[in-house]
Amino acid sequence: MLSKEIIARLIETAKNYADNAYCPYSGVAVGAALLCSDNIILGGCNIETGDYAAPSFGAGDTAIAKAISEGYNQMLALCLYSKDRLVYPNATTRQYLCEFNGDMKIIVANDQTYEVIDRLGAIYLFPPAVGDGDQTGA
C-alpha cells in the first residue's frame, strides 16, 4: 500500500518533470515519477519526434531508462501526470513495467484528481504485455 505522502511526492515529481517535456506535435506534456527500492524517486518526460522512422519516448519510458541506467531495477510504482487529462502507460511502457514488476502500482494524475491502479494488468487499453515465460517464439 502506498501512503498518501508517497503518492503526493510521486505526483509532485511527475508534475515537475512534465515541465521538461518536448511535445510540439501532440501538445500534451507528460511527466513520470518512478518509485524504486529505498524510496528513490526518478523522473522522466515525454520526448516527441516528427520523424516517423524514429520513435518518440513516453514519459514512463524515459523514467524507466533512467532507473535502469542508474542501477535501479526494483520498481515499485509509476506515476504519470498531465495537466488536463489522465494519461495511462503506453504499450511500450507497459511492456517495460511487466519486465521488471508487473504487479506494481500505477498512479495517473492531473491537476484535478488522481487514480491509483493496483496492478498493471488492470489496464486493458492494449493486449496483455509479454511477461516472463510468455515468449513462445510465435
Can you describe what each PLM-predicted range is?
Residues 58, 62-70:
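Feature captures the catalytic cores and cofactor-binding loops of soluble hydro-lyases/lyases
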Residues 35, 54, 95:
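Short, electropositive, low-hydrophobicity segments enriched in small/polar residues
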